[in-house]
Amino acid sequence: VEWTDFERATIKDIFSKIEYDVVGPATLARCLVVYPWTQRYFGKFGNLYNAAGIAENAMVSKHGITILHGLDRAVKNMDDIKNTYAELSVLHSEKLHVDPDNFKLLADCLTIVVAXRFGNGFTGEVQAAFQKFMAVVVSSLGKQYH
């Protein structure tokens, strides 16, 4: 993947400003509410029966934060995201049996949450860079499925 200077700077800027303990839980909670079939991967998380239960679930919050810290690895290794996520791809495909389409759903939810946090600063150009980055992440996580 070729990254422009603007794209690199934009991705680094976004992730330097994201409050992981807010955005991570909000992103995963949104995914579990909007796409309820994704809940099947989180059976041990307890109350996922409604939006309030999901939003208040400590395990959802913790895993949402973990996801964002996982994205940090991609930000720090933008030139080698596929290899950076090789083990994580194996884990999700072979052990957890996660449908790879769910990575795209989660990426879309993250884009919405980030856009709401950044407001007018999330311009079309910023969104294009962010979505390109997330598309590379999603592709890398799905690498083991092919």
From Swiss-Prot:
Gene Ontology molecular function terms on file? haptoglobin binding; heme binding; metal ion binding; organic acid binding; oxygen binding; oxygen carrier activity; peroxidase activity
- Which interval of the chain is the signal sequence? none
Residues the entry annotates as binding heme b: 63, 92
BP GO terms, sorted: hydrogen peroxide catabolic process
Q: Which family does it belong to?
A: Belongs to the globin family.
Q: What else is known?
A: This fish has 2 hemoglobins: Hb1 (major) and the minor Hb2 which constitutes about 5% of the total.
Q: Which gene encodes it?
A: hbb2
Q: Which domain of life is it from?
A: Eukaryota
* Name listed for the protein in its UniProt record: Hemoglobin subunit beta-2
Q: Where is the Globin domain?
A: 2-146
Instruction: Could you list this entry's UniProt keywords, alphabetically sorted.
Output: Heme, Iron, Metal-binding, Oxygen transport, Transport
Functional summary from the UniProt entry: Involved in oxygen transport from gills to the various peripheral tissues.
Per UniProt, subunit arrangement is: Hb2 is a heterotetramer of two alpha chains and two beta-2 chains.
- What are the annotated GO cellular component locations? blood microparticle; haptoglobin-hemoglobin complex; hemoglobin complex
Q: In which tissues is it expressed?
A: Red blood cells.
Which Pfam families does the UniProt record give?
Globin
Transmembrane segments in this chain: where?
Answer: none
